[in-house]
């Protein structure tokens, strides 16, 4: 029992999204990150799927609540409602499909309009293991990321390459913004929550108490 309680202890909770066209491997990325194995029987997500994991980011324990959204157009109205209050997102395309790459601008627009004002985004070129079938070069995607102020990695849900790093980089940047004061977990819709009431109290400015009549020497 004590071990379970310890495993659920965390300093912050971040709401994450995984977005992009259908067939890009979003569900497989989520499964690889949480279970450390490839989900080879994955079907297209219908609506939204959910997963969570606690990670250690620079000595802070962060619980990621991750919403894997359907990529088909007919589910867009449903999945858009889950954007609200997201602190971070993986924007996923398939390196073997230019169609999924060309759709990135629409996904990016949705994320920045509907999610948290300061949402942190990382671009993930998935299916890196299929390099021989590549339709989108690393350089082209890297330029897109730079132009749109995104972090960028190529990933493989099959081999696990860069999967954990993608989530870690995104979480690390959010944590850095909290520590610098750029992000305020107290702000409604930030997609961030304190995981411990004591930590929240420590990070809140201490109120100056007025001296009592006995202390003031009146």
UniProtKB/Swiss-Prot annotation:
Identify its membrane topology class. Peripheral membrane protein
Q: Where is this motif: Switch 1?
A: 44-49
Q: Which reaction does it catalyse?
A: GTP + H2O = GDP + phosphate + H(+)
Which controlled-vocabulary keywords does the entry list?
Cytoplasm, Endosome, GTP-binding, Hydrolase, Lipoprotein, Magnesium, Membrane, Metal-binding, Methylation, Nucleotide-binding, Phosphoprotein, Prenylation, Protein transport, Transport
A GO MF term:
GTPase activity
Share the record's PTM remark: Serotonylation of Gln-72 by TGM2 during activation and aggregation of platelets leads to constitutive activation of GTPase activity. Phosphorylated by CDK1 kinase during mitosis.
Activity regulation details = Regulated by guanine nucleotide exchange factors (GEFs) which promote the exchange of bound GDP for free GTP. Regulated by GTPase activating proteins (GAPs) which increase the GTP hydrolysis activity. Inhibited by GDP dissociation inhibitors (GDIs).
- NCBIfam families for the chain: small_GTP (TIGR00231)
Q: What is this protein called?
A: Ras-related protein Rab-4A
């Amino acid at each position: 029992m004590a071990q379970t309680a310890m495993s659920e202890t965390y300093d912050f909770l971040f709401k994450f999204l995984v977005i992009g066209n259908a067939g890009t491997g979003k569900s497989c990325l989520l499964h690889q990150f949480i279970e450390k194995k490839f989900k080879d029987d994955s079907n297209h997500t219908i609506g939204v799927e959910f997963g969570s994991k606690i990670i250690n980011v620079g000595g802070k324990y962060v619980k990621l609540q991750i919403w894997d959204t359907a990529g088909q157009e007919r589910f867009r109205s449903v999945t858009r409602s889950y954007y609200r209050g997201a602190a971070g997102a993986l924007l996923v395309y398939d390196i073997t499909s230019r169609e999924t790459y060309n759709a990135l601008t629409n996904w990016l627009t949705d994320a920045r309009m509907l999610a948290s004002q300061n949402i942190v985004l990382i671009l993930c070129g998935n299916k890196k293991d299929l390099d021989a079938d590549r339709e989108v070069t690393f350089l082209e995607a890297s330029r897109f990321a730079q132009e749109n102020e995104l972090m960028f990695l190529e990933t493989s849900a099959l081999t696990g390459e860069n999967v954990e790093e993608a989530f870690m980089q995104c979480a690390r940047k959010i944590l850095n913004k909290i520590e610098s004061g750029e992000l305020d977990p107290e702000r409604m819709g930030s997609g961030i929550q304190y995981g411990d009431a004591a930590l929240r109290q420590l990070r809140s400015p201490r109120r100056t108490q007025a001296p009592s009549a006995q202390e003031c020497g009146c």
